[in-house]
Swiss-Prot record:
Organism whose genome encodes this protein: Brucella anthropi (strain ATCC 49188 / DSM 6882 / CCUG 24695 / JCM 21032 / LMG 3331 / NBRC 15819 / NCTC 12168 / Alc 37) (Ochrobactrum anthropi)
Catalyzed reactions per annotation: dUMP + (6R)-5,10-methylene-5,6,7,8-tetrahydrofolate = 7,8-dihydrofolate + dTMP
Protein name listed in UniProt: Thymidylate synthase
This protein's record includes keyword Methyltransferase: yes
Catalytic residues (positions): 146
Length: 264
């Protein structure tokens, strides 16, 4: 994951110090792209240990179309706690937009199901897109989508994904986003009868919070290790049938976690 460390170093060295919504302050650049070849291993950080349980359960929660944190809490995942209301609701966030985008005529559009149909029927389509950014509902969301649009591309029997992320918390959020969308690409490739290709991560406002600078510098002193591999249960052919037990990260060796505060 030298690619990720290069991003950390680039922003620390070349970023602009700016204010932000949380009042914490950031150092940021605008426009940055990383590429990960999924045939070379699963792109999860080895210079600090990540809580993969949270990443997998959050992705399954998105795919369920769920917007209440009850499922996450039941599975020991707390990453959305700060934004939920007293009933655990988050408003029409990612899962709702992915699986139940509201149309003007009253219909609800299942973007993920439509994507799967297009992959089977017209894999060369340039419309293999899912959007979580719904301007009509942004103000009703507990947190507007940071990773807001992704597109798939099929070539030579391989499925690649490009994600556009409007707001990228490099130290805490981006490592989760890389692993999550890499896994989503692998899952969709499997059910579509394809092999995983690349995950391309395009960042808009790519920032390190001021109270993460020391942690970022510590991480930059560490040497990346060999990437692990992600085993996915080959018997699962339905994207919505995946369960936590269908995934196993093999050969994951990582340095200790580095704690940092969340900017809310």
């Amino acid at each position: 994951m030298r690619t990720y460390l290069d991003l950390l170093q680039h922003v620390l060295d070349n970023g602009t110090d700016r204010g932000d919504r949380t009042g914490t302050g950031t150092r940021s650049v605008f426009g940055y792209q990383m590429r990960f070849n999924l045939e070379e291993g699963f792109p999860v950080l080895t210079t600090k240990k990540l809580h993969l349980r949270s990443i997998i359960h959050e992705l399954l929660w998105f795919l369920k179309g769920d917007t209440n944190i009850a499922y996450l809490k039941e599975n020991g995942v707390s990453i959305w706690d700060e934004w939920a209301d007293k009933n655990g609701d988050l408003g029409p966030v990612y899962g709702y937009q992915w699986r139940s985008w509201p149309a003007p005529d009253g219909r609800h559009i299942d973007q993920i199901a439509n994507l799967l149909k297009m992959l089977h029927g017209n894999p060369n389509s340039r419309r293999l897109i899912v959007s979580a950014w719904n301007p009509a509902l942004v103000d009703e969301m507990a947190l507007p989508p940071c990773h807001c649009l992704f597109q798939f591309y099929v070539a030579d029997g391989k499925l690649s994904c490009q994600l556009y992320q409007r707001s990228a918390d490099i130290f805490l959020g981006v490592p989760f986003n890389i692993a999550s969308y890499a896994l989503l690409t692998m899952m969709i490739a499997q059910v579509a009868g394809l092999k995983p290709g690349e995950f391309i991560h395009t960042l808009g406002d790519a920032h390190i919070y001021a109270n993460h600078f020391d942690q970022a510098r510590l991480q930059l002193t560490r040497i990346p290790k060999k990437l692990p591999t992600m085993w996915i249960n080959p018997d699962v052919k339905d994207l919505f049938a995946f369960r936590f037990e269908d995934f196993q990260l093999e050969g994951y060796e990582a340095d200790p976690t580095i704690k940092a505060p969340i900017a809310v």
